[in-house]
């Protein structure tokens, strides 16, 4: 089977590797986003997908606009591909491109459609407190993740799973599900199922404002957003930005690590956003709009991530100090 692979981030790498390892599949070319300047040296850095393609000596196309680039469109028209596989590519394909391959354009999407259509399904699913997610393969149409569904696979989200961890799990699941999808499509063993638009929810591009912690929210809601937007959740402390990397909501002692289950919380309260306890081996405890939140891992501006316990021991925190949105 001849495949053109469209993908960009780390999430897409397991699927590309799985396809490359299959002797019945030929990757004609990889289409990925243009290199981006990153880091202190402002160097051009290739996407994770491009790096794999280069290692495997697969031709790479990087149009700024896949819909308008004449060279890319000519190549795709002449590719004689059986399918275009799209995994977190980052650009919308034109109706012309969607109609080119024999089996269509097959997307590996990081949610259980029609929930969490859009650019950031893994992050928003966790940020909104979902306890289950998964992968959907679908035939792409002109809409944003609106095409008929092919196969689904499910996985639970644990209380302390973050977007990086769930994304890694889904990336591997997507690779397996995509191979099964291609095989069954080729043998006409799948009946595409239309999505119910009434059940749709959305996962838009994440904005910098989404990273800001609102301490008036409940501890559980803040915890979910810290996990979902990992490692970017942000507050202000002593006039400086502070990333919050991991938290523990103290709402249900039974869900806490054993060493915390015996803590007496009955006397802890204070102004929203303030430190109400300093647990030397664990971290500061902060009053939220509803409940208490332990800061388990943080990152001061310009520093490496550190445990909440290290913050307590090394920063001379005091009860009553305020974290600001």
From Swiss-Prot:
Keywords: Protein biosynthesis, Transferase. Its EC number is 2.1.2.9. (6S)-5,6,7,8-tetrahydrofolate binds at residues 111-114. It is an enzyme of class 2 (transferase). GO terms for molecular function: methionyl-tRNA formyltransferase activity. This is Methionyl-tRNA formyltransferase. Attaches a formyl group to the free amino group of methionyl-tRNA(fMet). The formyl group appears to play a dual role in the initiator identity of N-formylmethionyl-tRNA by promoting its recognition by IF2 and preventing the misappropriation of this tRNA by the elongation apparatus.
